[in-house]
Structures are given as structure tokens and as C-alpha cells.
Amino acid sequence: MNIIDDLKWRGAINQQTDEAGLKELTENQSVSLYCGIDPTGDSMHIGHLIPFMILKRFQLAGHHPYVVVGGGTGAIGDPSGKNSERKLQTMDQVKHNQDGLSAQMYKLFGHDENFSIVNNYDWLSKISLLDFLRDYGKLFSVNTMLNKEVVASRLEVGISYTEFTYQILQSVDFLHLYRAEHVQLQIGGADQWGNITAGTDLIHRLEGNDAKAYGLTIPLLLKADGTKFGKTAGGAVWLNPERTSPYEFYQFWINQDDRDVVKYLKYFTFLSHEEIDRLAETVKTAPEKREAQRRLAEEVTEFVHGKQAVVEAENITKALFTGDVQSLTADEIEQGFKGVPSADVSAEKQNIVLWLVDATKFEPSRRQAREDIKNGAIRINGEKVTDVEAEIDPSAAFNGKFVIVRRGKKRYFLAHVK
């Protein structure tokens, strides 16, 4: 199946500058294409992942993707999707963020000869102000630029000349890559349509109307409840494991709504059409098994964090469900118990009642602690404690780093042994 037909089946195409021309181009040859990302932070979140999943599909189909990490445009600020001016970053911040994003890109695409990361600072920084105005500014109509959605949406609240010129800079990126690397396709989110078409227009003006330069945008991904995909009550879901642990990442996907899961399987996995159709059927016939959600979580977590991260996430999930926490490693505990109530405790042995009340503050009183212990409601590191005279050794398990306390079936507490 042609890559364009595959993307249409997945619901991943919003607009194309020339559908027939692009389909013909991708059928007959390997195409170089690009997507840009400005280094406004040092990590992508799952919202950023959407266009780069498309880029990855092109790579797997034999094409050559380029990622433009915008060291130049990132110093300016893209007005797309913003209702106010971006705060300008220092060049040191931009460089730090570039390095973080580039590392993530190589993890997703591999150090492959058919994948390239480039920095638009390398060519934009060489253009003088006079050259910019003469060679490029002269080719852009202010009237046309004002009518682009990305600018028009900002006119009431105001837009600086700096951000106003952003679409010219992005157009220069496309022109440079077209000339230097024979890049013929730019992809981006739906809000990038104005910037992308400005680039194809510039190429056609300077290289001729028969120049094969195309644009493709991806729809805004909405959840079944109408809200924007990628946001949670706890904020963004990051690709950086220091910000969002692989377990939390896995849990985000496994907890998706039945109404959304098939759409996400199409967008975020490389499963075949037949396998996705089969999983879609299980959502209808056996939704309680959540097979589609589990497969989604496995596939996306492996793509971003690797196979071992999936194994660890499933170990944590099983341990928390069954209460068998003894099988967990210290690293898995750190991931799985992030966000549960916790406290630092000493490594000294102590009476269990005093430890629960004084050291951890887990129990409100000694009377309550004794009652819970006698009733078998307290488990320490997965083992039931029934003796109120028992002594706890905080350094006895999990490399002497943690003590896991559970009351009843769901109330967990994590003690960090210092």
C-alpha cells in the first residue's frame, strides 16, 4: 500500500497541497521529507510525537526523513497556536534544548544513514538583514501573510514583527532543504498549514512552478470527550523518563477510553491494518479484557523507551494489582510508587506500632495502628503483620532503600530509608 493511502486509512491526513502529485511522487521513488521542532524545551511530550510518528512511517517505507531542530527559529518564536508572545530564550537555553531533543530523535529514528537531523541556525545565521529583506522579504505579500490563520488569529491581541516574520524563516528552511538536500515534502500539525504553504509558494517562485515541493498536515487529535489529546490532570506526558517514568507512560496508554483506543492504535503503532481491525473487534465484543489498550501501551512504550521498559511496567502493574510487591526491583518501586504518600525514615530497627505512628505518620494513633495490625490490615513489603510487638528492620529489603506499607487493598505508602 502506498504511504499516502496508509496515512489516509489511519486518519492522519488533514490537508495536502497536491494529493495526486504527492501520491505519484512517493510511489515511484524514495522521497526526502522533513518536519521541524523548535527547541522551546529539552524534551518532547506525547503531543509532539504525532508528526514524528508520521515521519517514522515514511522512514519505514524507504524514504529519508529530516528533522529540523530550530536553533534559529527557536530563538525567534513560532506564533502558531499561541495567543501571546513567546518569551525569548538565551542561546545557551536553545543549545541545551537542542541537545535534549536531538538525543530523543536519535532514539526514535536510530543512527541510520536514511535519517538526518539538521539545525536551521546553520543557514539562517548566515543571512544578513539586507539579504533577508532583498532576497526573501520582497517575495512575501504582507496582505497574504495577514490572511494566514497563524497571523490573523493574533491580530487582535497583537503580534511583534519578530514573530510576524516566522513564516518567512520557515519558508527559507524549506527552500534551503529543497536546494541542498532535495527535500520535497514538509509535514506538520494542522496549525502549520499557513507556514508550510508559504514555503511551497516560495519554492515555486524561485525554482519554477514545475518544482515538486509538497506540504501535508495532520489533523488536530481530539479525545472522544472533545478535549485535546495529550493533556492529563497531572500535566503533560513527557518522553523524558526523568519527567514521566516509563511506568507512568505505560499507564497513560493502558487507561485510554474504549472510544479512543482504536484511533490511537492507528496513529501511534506500526501494527498492520489486519491486527488493528482485530483489536477493534475486541473492543466491541470483549471490552472488559482491554486487550486493545494493553497492546497500545506495549507498542508505544517499547517504541519510546525500549522493550525492557515494557517488562518493568507490566511487572509493576501486576505487583500493584496482586499486592505481591516482593518481586519488584528498587528501580521498579521508584517508578511505580511515584506520587504515593511517602516519608524518609532511618534504617534503625523499631517496634512496628511506633514506626507506623512516629516514623512514617502513616497511622494517626497507636490505638489505630494496633487495631489495624490485629485485624490483618497492614502489610509490610507484601507480608501481613499481625503481631503488635513485632520489630521492623527498614533496611531488610529492596537493597535497603525502601519499605512498602499497605493498608487494606489500595492504600499504599512508601518509606525511603536514609
Swiss-Prot record:
Subunit structure: Homodimer.
UniProt short sequence motif 'KMSKS' region, positions renumbered to this chain: 228-232
GO MF annotation list: ATP binding; RNA binding; tyrosine-tRNA ligase activity
Species this protein is from: Lactiplantibacillus plantarum (strain ATCC BAA-793 / NCIMB 8826 / WCFS1)
Motif ('HIGH' region): 39-48
Source organism, top-level taxon: Bacteria
Catalytic activity: tRNA(Tyr) + L-tyrosine + ATP = L-tyrosyl-tRNA(Tyr) + AMP + diphosphate + H(+)
PROSITE patterns reported in the protein's UniProt record: AA_TRNA_LIGASE_I, S4
Listed EC numbers: 6.1.1.1
First-level EC class: ligase
Role this protein plays: Catalyzes the attachment of tyrosine to tRNA(Tyr) in a two-step reaction: tyrosine is first activated by ATP to form Tyr-AMP and then transferred to the acceptor end of tRNA(Tyr).
The entry's keywords: Aminoacyl-tRNA synthetase, ATP-binding, Cytoplasm, Ligase, Nucleotide-binding, Protein biosynthesis, RNA-binding
Binding-site residues, ATP: K231
Protein name: Tyrosine--tRNA ligase
CDD domains cross-referenced by the UniProt entry: S4, TyrRS_core
Binding-site positions, L-tyrosine: Y34, Y166, Q170
Family: Belongs to the class-I aminoacyl-tRNA synthetase family. TyrS type 1 subfamily.
Xref: SUPFAM superfamilies: Alpha-L RNA-binding motif, Nucleotidylyl transferase
GO CC annotation terms, alphabetical: cytosol
Subcellular location: Cytoplasm
